[in-house]
Amino acid sequence: MRTNKLSILLGNRATGKTIYGKSLIRAALKSGKAVLVVDTFDHPAYAALQRITPDAIADIRPGECVRCYGSDIEAILHGCTNLYNALLVMEDATKYIYGTITDDVKQILFDSKQKNVDVLMMFHSWTACPPAVFRVADNLIIKKTGDNCEVRKKDCPNFAEVYKAWETVERSADKYVTKCVKLQ
């Protein structure tokens, strides 16, 4: 299955971002894609996955589900530029993608379609996700963030739909409520 979508998942702590991400992982594996989970630390939710080094990212095979984590996030992101035919889950991207995005992150984002890579980037808030990421994303998955989506009004394609979804999420009593909006 070839979708090659870049998705942003926004949500505060304990709103179910990782659970949502794991559901996408299951779907990717079912379709035969490889999966790579990237993080800066040994996230307990992914403890069962084999850990690989950044230089092994290019060798991930269809149907494999692995993780790469550590403090040298630059090496990990550079390794991700060699990923093909996979789902790339960027767990807690708030910690390593911010401000002006790096050349490696640009390459990951802009080459994803040619490399058959779906990308899921998880951020804690609207302000934590760089404006450039909003401008190129295909999908926005909204959970409770506690901040206002209007800070990204100029950066979000399809903002009227985004605002409606955000309003629904923030007004809900369900702390796990999720709304998805197609941006492109």
Question: Where are the regions a protein language model picked out?
Answer:
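A general structural signal for short secondary-structure junctions and capping/turn motifs
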Residues: I25-L29, A132-V133, T168-A173
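Structural signal for conserved beta-strand scaffold positions within catalytic alpha/beta enzyme cores
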Residues: T53, R67, I141-I142, K182
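Conserved P-loop NTPase motor cores
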Residues: S7-R26, F41, G70-E161
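Structural motif
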Residues: S7, A34-L36, E64-R67, L87
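Walker A/P-loop NTP-binding active-site region of P-loop NTPases
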Residues: A14-I60
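Phosphate-binding P-loop
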Residues: M1-N4
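A short, well-structured beta->alpha microelement
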Residues: A47-T81
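Phosphate-binding and hydrolysis-coupling loops of NTP-dependent motor/remodeling domains
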Residues: N148-Q184
